[in-house]
């Protein structure tokens, strides 16, 4: 892999990484852009999972999990968030989850005590892992697509989201 830093993408929705040639399932991709360093794991043909995010600047407070990224000359859909991906993040206050995410791993956002605003754009989430949202701010609001409100409320409650958190 190249040790050169890539230039931030012109489109803030798709951070890029250097072209490293062929990318295989299981391989880890690091993308550094204007929002920080994102680490992804290739999960299938054209799909990746967020492993971790080291945000910088204003992005430390407002974290975005992108719909897709560009890496190795290819566009990848971000379809899942790994277990423990942002567990214990002390600065994150808001989180936006992209429209292609289908799975959120266990403890993904657990103990993010300052997290007050979660926006889920995806209409495809089928799995939210155990304790994924445990111990986020008790005054938090989770905004979900209207058609998925009932389904997501059930999934979020199973994931130990506090009963005090509002689901809109």
Positions of the model-derived regions?
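Structural signature of tandem-repeat unit edges
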Residues: 42-45, 58-80, 90-103, 113-127, ...
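A structural signal for leucine-rich repeat
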Residues: 131-135, 154-159
């Amino acid at each position: 892999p190249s040790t050169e830093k890539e230039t931030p993408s012109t489109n803030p929705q798709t951070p890029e990484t250097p072209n490293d040639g062929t990318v295989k399932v299981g391989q880890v991709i690091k993308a550094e852009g204007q929002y920080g360093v994102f680490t992804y794991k290739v999960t299938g043909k054209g799909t990746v999972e967020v492993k971790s995010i080291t945000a910088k600047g204003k992005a430390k407070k407002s974290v975005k999990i992108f719909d897709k990224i560009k890496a190795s000359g290819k566009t990848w859909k971000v379809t899942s968030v790994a277990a423990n991906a942002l567990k214990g993040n002390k600065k994150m206050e808001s989180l936006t989850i992209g429209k292609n995410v289908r799975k959120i791993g266990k403890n993904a956002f657990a103990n993010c005590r300052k997290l007050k605003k979660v926006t889920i754009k995806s209409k495809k989430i089928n799995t939210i892992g155990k304790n994924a949202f445990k111990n986020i701010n008790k005054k938090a609001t989770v905004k979900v697509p209207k058609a998925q409100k009932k389904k997501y409320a059930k999934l979020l409650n199973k994931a130990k989201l506090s009963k005090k958190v509002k689901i809109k």
